[in-house]
Amino acid sequence: MSHPEAPITPEVEADLAIARRGCDELLVESEFARKLARSRATGVPLRIKLGLDPTAPDIHLGHTVVLNKMRQLQDLGHNVIFLIGDFTSTIGDPSGRNSTRPPLTREQIETNAKTYYAQASLVLDPARTEIRYNSEWCDPLGARGMIQLASRYTVARMMEREDFTRRFKGGVPIAVHEFLYPLLQGYDSVALKADLELGGTDQKFNLLVGRELQKEYGQEQQCILTMPLLVGTDGVEKMSKSKGNYIGISEAPESMFGKLMSISDTLMWRYYELLSFRSLADIAALKAEIDGGRNPRDAKVALAQEIVARFHSPQAAEAALAAFEARFRDGAIPEDMPEVTVGGAPQGILRILREAGLVASGSEAQRNVEQGGVRVNGDRVEDKSLQLSAGTYVVQVGKRKFARVKLVG
């Protein structure tokens, strides 16, 4: 489908820079620039799609990277479609899997979807967000429609997908229904007539299928924008609940603030790029000040306050800062403490205490836990069998013994 060309103005270039900020890939960038130019010239907003399968009930900051990008594009005046994959969740996304993902029940999906959107609304503007469910068009397809859809894509193309190839070569079963997942996600773009689809880097194949299917159905092809996976608080692996290196957006303000203050100075700038709504010019100016001798802690406090304020309130952010500073002022947590690396993650708290030099023996470690004298990241340890996964933790025994423990696998 052809459209009249519109000029690439400085305003379009500025919009394109916002889209590119922090992204991994923007395909095809020249096409997207033309879409932006046409939108500015005609006043017709682009249709920007983000699909999420509600496979878990809670969202952490890693999930918000792509939501932040949606909000930035939403603030440019474009139509944002928050697509809940209630139908595709019953299949299970095979992206990045070494085995078949178990499907969810309708009840699980409905429960998770409510929580997902409520939390996503803390980033997106609900008044300007279109919510859709892909069961709207997938349920009516039926067997005939599903077969017709499947006829538009080849097995050879499907096997270009890295995780399918790896499983096939390794003799790991691939169920036929798993081929349907990227097809149905792609068909979502056809049903919604999407101009741009967003996703994580692990979703690139699925997003490209949508682009190809739109061509098959005679539509203008969507562009795709992939966002990187956020590194967790340990600075090593992607943010994940299973790794214990995550910051949940529904966490208490003080906990959220404290975890953000625990990240390294280097990782802080990556968080600024992917999580902050401050302009790149503002961030560059702040970085120049830090490079010029200003305390990096000031920049970290500003980031922590911004994020806590977004998911709670400015008042909660101020209170979290006050509580954090009080702990240092009262000698609760020193700014400087020994740093210890402990291997063998996941590792038990009793051994961690010994390895960190906070206790002299296992019996002393056990006694301190039983007496409530051990804290990890400020939280009292009540279970002597507690296991900690890989990550960085502030471990405290009594009032005066502290160590920053980096737990590695």
Swiss-Prot record:
Alphabetical keyword list: Aminoacyl-tRNA synthetase, ATP-binding, Cytoplasm, Ligase, Nucleotide-binding, Protein biosynthesis, RNA-binding
Pfam families linked to this entry: SYY_C-terminal, tRNA-synt_1b
GO MF term list: ATP binding; RNA binding; tyrosine-tRNA ligase activity
InterPro entries in alphabetical order: aa-tRNA-synth_I_CS, aa-tRNA-synth_Ic, Rossmann-like_a/b/a_fold, S4_RNA-bd, S4_RNA-bd_sf, SYY-like_C, Tyr-tRNA-ligase, Tyr-tRNA-ligase_bac-type
Motif extent ('KMSKS' region): 238-242
Sequence motif: 'HIGH' region, positions: 54-63
Binding site for ATP: 241
An individual GO BP term: tyrosyl-tRNA aminoacylation
Subcellular location: Cytoplasm
Signal peptide annotation: none
Domain S4 RNA-binding: 347-407
E.C. code: 6.1.1.1
GO CC terms of this entry: cytosol
UniProt-listed SUPFAM superfamilies: Alpha-L RNA-binding motif, Nucleotidylyl transferase
Reactions catalysed, as given in the entry: tRNA(Tyr) + L-tyrosine + ATP = L-tyrosyl-tRNA(Tyr) + AMP + diphosphate + H(+)
Record text on subunit structure and interactions: Homodimer.
HAMAP family: Tyr_tRNA_synth_type2
Function according to Swiss-Prot or TrEMBL: Catalyzes the attachment of tyrosine to tRNA(Tyr) in a two-step reaction: tyrosine is first activated by ATP to form Tyr-AMP and then transferred to the acceptor end of tRNA(Tyr).
Family: Belongs to the class-I aminoacyl-tRNA synthetase family. TyrS type 2 subfamily.
Protein name per UniProt: Tyrosine--tRNA ligase
Native source species: Bordetella pertussis (strain Tohama I / ATCC BAA-589 / NCTC 13251)
